[in-house]
Swiss-Prot record:
Gene for this chain: aroB
Essential cofactor(s): Co(2+); Zn(2+); NAD(+)
Protein name in UniProt: 3-dehydroquinate synthase
Pfam families in UniProt: DHQ_synthase (PF01761), DHQS_C (PF24621)
Organism listed in the record: Nitrosomonas eutropha (strain DSM 101675 / C91 / Nm57)
Keywords noted in UniProt: Amino-acid biosynthesis, Aromatic amino acid biosynthesis, Cobalt, Cytoplasm, Lyase, Metal-binding, NAD, Nucleotide-binding, Zinc
Reactions catalysed, as given in the entry: 7-phospho-2-dehydro-3-deoxy-D-arabino-heptonate = 3-dehydroquinate + phosphate
Length: 369
């Protein structure tokens, strides 16, 4: 399927209309007609990394040059361990060296780390410049490029420093997924499964039937998975941009998952891998609280297993998990707020989880030594 599909993120209820479009399809990197309305000064900074630059940077720069758009590239090291102040300053250095002005947009060409760093730089440089997301991983196309969360990690906690700052446009070129390593593809599927679990039981059913086609990168299957994921996220973000309510449900599995990433060291586990194990922990806790059935947890585990994702966390002591989870962004009045499942297709927040049940989950859901 080569037809382009579009999803609107409606953010027009505030003083200024910050709505934008997500375009999904094949070979969108060269669809400069989609980019030009957001390049008023005919100059742009392209932020990418050492992995993506050899694959797609010149393709994008050449297409822009044909329309007289001047660009320069900022090539960052690749990896979650580089999502920090030092790497962020590399972007600021380049923007200042090229005397970029407030109308100079930043284009994020890469995965979630590139997008988060570029967005935070755009939110901060000159107190705000435009930016565009061109995500090249499945995880970024279905999740991190949409919704305006930007930021960096701190040694004590993931994504603890950042800003809400919306892109002007998202171009999800599914053709870039052909060069994505299998491990990265599976990590992105973890976030796709999340959308079915929190919001759409029919989508979860569809994923059960189409997992092998997704893993085989069938274009039509992939485009539908991306579109449906973006539709769900756009709907939730439009209702709650700054995560004061329903948007927190998008963090299913992330309280446990961030603890895994932080404790094991950024980059040891891919974000999607940690979310997968964390989602199984959340499902186990939901079962112990009698919110969902054993049959539900079995279905969830089987789907993650069929995607080739971890269903057990690393062997960290419950105490270390708890220590890391206390630094979660959703902590309120000192209490950890968990996203739990009420059924497949519906989730809710709970800040009254008994410590004993939580410890049981943490003991049951880690790999054997």
């Amino acid at each position: 399927m080569n037809a382009m599909e579009s999803v609107e993120v409606a953010l027009d209820t505030l003083p200024e209309n910050r709505s934008y479009t997500i375009h999904i399809g094949q070979e969108l990197l060269t669809r400069i007609d989609l980019l030009l309305p957001h390049l008023p000064g005919k100059k742009a900074a392209i932020v990418t990394n050492t992995t993506i630059a050899p694959l797609y940077l010149e393709k994008l720069r050449s297409a822009l040059a044909e329309h007289q758009v001047e660009t320069f590239a900022v090539i960052l090291p690749d990896g979650e361990q580089y999502k920090n102040w030092e790497t962020l300053n590399l972007i600021f250095d380049a923007l200042l060296e090229h005397r970029c002005e407030r109308k100079t947009p930043l284009i994020a060409l890469g995965g979630g780390v590139v997008g988060d760093l570029t967005g935070f730089a755009a939110a901060s440089y000159l107190r705000g410049v435009p930016f565009i997301q061109i995500p090249t991983t499945l995880l970024a196309q279905v999740d991190s490029s949409v919704g305006g969360k930007t930021g960096i990690n701190h040694p004590l906690g993931k994504n603890m420093i950042g800003a809400f700052y919306q892109p002007r446009l998202v171009l999800a070129d599914s053709a870039t997924l052909t060069t994505l390593p299998d491990r990265e593809l599976r990590a992105g599927i973890a976030e796709v499964i999340k959308y079915g679990l929190i919001h759409d039981a029919d989508f979860f059913d569809w994923l059960e039937r189409h997992m092998q086609q997704l893993l085989a990168r069938d274009p039509e299957t992939m485009n539908y998975a991306i579109r449906r994921s973006c539709e769900i996220k756009a709907e939730i973000v439009s209702l709650d941009e700054r995560e004061s309510g329903v948007r927190a449900l998008l963090n299913l599995g992330h309280t446990f998952g961030h603890a895994i990433e932080n404790t094991m060291g950024y980059g040891a586990w891919l974000h999607g891998e940690a979310v997968a194990a964390g989602t199984l922990m959340a499902a186990d806790l939901s079962k112990r609280l009698q919110r969902i059935t054993s049959q539900d947890t079995d279905r969830i585990q089987h789907l993650f297993e069929n995607a080739g994702l971890p269903v057990k966390g690393p062997r960290i002591t419950p105490e270390r998990y708890l220590e890391s989870m206390q630094l979660d962004k959703k902590v309120k009045d000192g209490a950890i707020r968990f996203i739990l499942l009420d059924r497949i297709g519906k989730a809710s927040l709970d800040n009254t989880v008994p410590t004993l049940l939580l410890l049981e989950t943490l003991s049951a859901c880690v790999a054997n030594a």
